[in-house]
């Protein structure tokens, strides 16, 4: 199934809006973490061909999924919530729920920009071509293992 084309600017605008509303209740480290990642997203928009920018934004989104879970679970106000507080918490949770979908779209953009597959299954798949390397069980042994390289005399030591 092919993912629909979603503009990176739409993802940034949506998460910026939800993060701003989430900061009504969760300020401090929640705001720093999310707005820093959104700044990486602005960098990814500014440099359309940069694999580094989009990969940093993708990694940051993945990290903020974990960080948002921690922030919401630790700093959730348990005593009394006003309607504004409930709205802010709801927007922070909605932002958290939309981040995995955003990660899928951003990963698709990463692949379009020329990024490689992040998940390597080398031990399950076929082995890499190592024809340029000499095997350990090679029958070719050096003629004289203590031979002096050309252009160096016996008294020139490397230590």
Swiss-Prot record:
Extracellular topological segments: 1-23, 77-86
PANTHER family for the chain: TYPE-1 ANGIOTENSIN II RECEPTOR-ASSOCIATED PROTEIN
Membrane topology field: Multi-pass membrane protein
Record carries keyword Transmembrane: yes
Gene Ontology BP annotations: regulation of blood pressure; response to hypoxia
Cytoplasmic side stretches: 45-55, 108-159
Expression sites (tissue/organ): Ubiquitous but more abundant in kidney, heart, pancreas and thyroid.
Gene transcribed to yield this protein: AGTRAP
Protein's name in the database: Type-1 angiotensin II receptor-associated protein
Residues bearing PTM Phosphoserine: 126-127, 138, 153
Renumbered residue ranges of the record's region Interaction with AGTR1: 110-122
Keyword list, A-Z: Cytoplasmic vesicle, Endoplasmic reticulum, Golgi apparatus, Membrane, Phosphoprotein, Transmembrane, Transmembrane helix
Task of the protein: Appears to be a negative regulator of type-1 angiotensin II receptor-mediated signaling by regulating receptor internalization as well as mechanism of receptor desensitization such as phosphorylation. Also induces a decrease in cell proliferation and angiotensin II-stimulated transcriptional activity.
Location relative to the cell: Endoplasmic reticulum membrane; Golgi apparatus membrane; Cytoplasmic vesicle membrane
TM helices/strands, residue ranges: 24-44, 56-76, 87-107
Record's subunit section: Interacts with RACK1, and with the C-terminal region of AGTR1.
Sequence segments annotated as region (Disordered): 140-159
Domain of life: Eukaryota
MF terms (GO), sorted A to Z: angiotensin type II receptor activity; identical protein binding
Phosphothreonine found at: 135
One annotated Gene Ontology cellular component of this protein: cell cortex
